[in-house]
From Swiss-Prot:
GO terms for biological process: translation. This protein binds specifically to 23S rRNA; its binding is stimulated by other ribosomal proteins, e.g. L4, L17, and L20. It is important during the early stages of 50S assembly. It makes multiple contacts with different domains of the 23S rRNA in the assembled 50S subunit and ribosome. Part of the 50S ribosomal subunit. This is Large ribosomal subunit protein uL22. Coiled coil: none annotated. One of its GO terms (molecular function) is rRNA binding. Signal peptide: none annotated. Keywords: Ribonucleoprotein, Ribosomal protein, RNA-binding, rRNA-binding. Belongs to the universal ribosomal protein uL22 family.
Length: 129
């Protein structure tokens, strides 16, 4: 049986990937109720953006794939580096330093815990043969 995964992607988010990964690591593997609570009370700049992305993935799962909301959990979430905007910062004697304004691509995948149970049962039955 093929597992159904709901996916949401936020591209070109103006948060450095290093800072976004701190928040993403908190919710990986959690069920959606726990993840929403964690993101609501996390005092980081990336938390509201990731919460909005989580809510989008939940809507995709419930409306498009008809998955049960109570059984959803965060299967995988990762942050990739996006574009780097290069800006000049003026320094002494007419010189300048480069400032790299970093962006992120955040990907969040959620699935139902019943999908996890059925895939584990298939693996166990396949290994016995």
């Amino acid at each position: 049986m093929e597992t159904k995964n709901a996916k949401a992607i936020a591209r070109k988010v103006s948060i450095a990937p290093r800072k976004a990964r701190l928040v993403v690591d908190l919710i990986r593997g959690k069920n959606i109720a726990q993840a929403q609570a964690i993101l609501t009370f996390t005092p980081k700049v990336a938390a509201p953006v990731i919460l909005k992305l989580l809510n989008s993935a939940i809507s995709n799962a419930v409306n498009n794939l008809k998955l049960n909301r109570e059984q959803l959990y965060v299967k995988e979430v990762f942050v990739n580096e996006g574009l780097r905007l290069k800006r000049m910062f003026p320094r002494a004697k007419g010189s300048g330093d480069m400032i790299k304004k970093r962006t992120s691509h955040i990907t969040l995948v959620i699935t139902s815990s019943t999908n996890l149970q059925t895939s584990k049962e298939e693996e166990q039955s396949g290994s016995k043969n």
